[in-house]
Amino acid sequence: MEKEVIAYLDNETIIDSQSVKNTNLKEIYFDNSKESLEVIRHSCAHLMAQAIKNLYPEAKFFVGPVIEDGFYYDFRVESKIGEEDLVKIEKKMKELAEAKIEISKYEITKNEALAKFQNDDLKQEVLLRIPDGAVSIYKQGEFEDLCRGPHVPNTKFLRFFKLTRVAGAYLGGDEKREMLTRIYGTAFADKESLKEYLTIIEEAKKRDHRKLGTELKLFTFDDEIGGGLPIWLSNGARLRSKLEHILYKIHRLRGYEPVRGPELLKADAWKISGHYANYKENMYFTQIDEQEYGIKPMNCVGHIKIYQSDVRSYRDLPLKFFEYGVVHRHEKSGVLHGLFRVREFTQDDAHIFCMPSQIKEQVLEILAFVDNLMKLFDFSYEMEISTKPEKAIGDDEIWEVATKALKEALDEQGLKYGIDEGGGAFYGPKIDIKITDALKRKWQCGTIQVDFNLPSRFKLEYTDSDNEKKQPVMLHRAILGSFERFIGILTEHCAGEFPFFIAPTAVGIVPIGEAHIAYAKEIQKELLELNIDSEVYEKNESLSKKIRTAEKQKLPMILVLGDDEVAKRSVALRDRRAKEQKNLSLDEFIKLVKEKMSEVHF
């Protein structure tokens, strides 16, 4: 069957089929391509709004954009809408889709639009946010809404969709404004793709790090402490400590020096850096001795001051500082999400001060570091370079040198990468590291950022080989991004079944009776000397219940100890990953776990 054209692509702009006058544009067919799904999902958001309007005539709508993997619409309605109402909204959407309603577009002036929607305060809000000029309106049946589009030409294209959840959302993301209802959904071009996506969604619910974090006793949150401030429990703290230890060793082997800057800096420092003018709303400030101080949202200023603490020569470069830096950033309560979006987090942060000629060499080394670490946790990854934006500091030559160095480093490593033209920060180009988890979801984690700005603002210098003062380039580099976010991603990636070398509790030791506890404690001590955490299940419970408790904690290994094991100094091993049970001497078991720990190599 021949695919139908639903829109056209003009460079990177998607245009409605009905708006096209130039027939030389690239056709967008009705399929699951990125461009097609954007049109389908945008249209499906309007289909949902039309269904809601039919069911709740008093409903008023704010905005309904396409997001990654779907869409949402924010609206006001008198009735309280819950998850149970999604079924009837979906049913109405299907009726409208089956009715094959033509979707048309027309344009009016902004003033005409303000008059047309004069009794709709939410539409007035939308119109106040857009520039003067022509305003486009999409119409399907009796339903009309403001929208830039594009949309499919007919509701018949909107058959394979699912409404996924209901939430609250502040008007315009402003916590001081009213709370609107938000419904999320997704849509595809065919039934199979929708079914596959919904299967992944169900699996993602089981793997949700917030759910597993509670079940595995990794972390918690407390309203009396405050939103976005994670509390690490013993298991989570052990997991995090193991990750920190691995990273520390890799950093040291790669020539990084550990440093630590203060968490509180005078506002003057943030004024020099530009954070005060450009990032103040995301920071926390306080007064000490009638002077203003800011809690750091980033670690770079502290590292700059460490660079400035000594006279630097070209022979000293590159200088590589790293820190597990605790930072605080003000996030609106509505966007806080488990460990993924918090107000306090710890970055695996490093700053490299080097000469422009050393950028490529340093980026190559960072890429090797990234590859090493991602393979360790079984993540695939991809890269994206963001280039010079319209507004930028630094001359074209230094931008060209830096961007070329990033591209050459990626090419030399044989890594595929995308290019976000003009998407760089004003102070330098960057590489974004995006990892793919077991559910094929992509996560933005690390960044390699070239910076000409801060060295200039703080007047950093080194003495060159010709005895002249030169300004170094600064590379900001985080591989995990933050420990919190990465641990959240890792928890979902492995469904809480952490690799042996990083598991908070790697071995569960189950003595059958009281007579076997002493031997269990002996094994526990021996494992601890190998930096392997274990737990002895010594409660007065049945053997099956003890084993079940250990299995619920998703421990990599469980040892069962009875009279025979005590007498022979052996263990009955249950290996979760290998899905096998076997008897080993204690010496053989210790050899086995040593081998597992040695799998972590750099």
Curated annotation (Swiss-Prot):
InterPro entries: aa-tRNA-synt_IIb, aa-tRNA-synth_II, aa-tRNA-synth_II/BPL/LPL, Anticodon-bd, Anticodon-bd_dom_sf, Thr-tRNA-ligase_IIa, Thr/Ala-tRNA-synth_IIc_edit, ThrRS_anticodon. Its cofactor is Zn(2+). It is found in: Cytoplasm. Its EC number is 6.1.1.3. GO terms for biological process: threonyl-tRNA aminoacylation. It catalyses: tRNA(Thr) + L-threonine + ATP = L-threonyl-tRNA(Thr) + AMP + diphosphate + H(+). Pfam families: HGTP_anticodon, tRNA-synt_2b, tRNA_SAD. This is Threonine--tRNA ligase. It comes from Campylobacter jejuni subsp. jejuni serotype O:6 (strain 81116 / NCTC 11828). The lineage of its organism: Bacteria, Pseudomonadati, Campylobacterota, Epsilonproteobacteria, Campylobacterales.
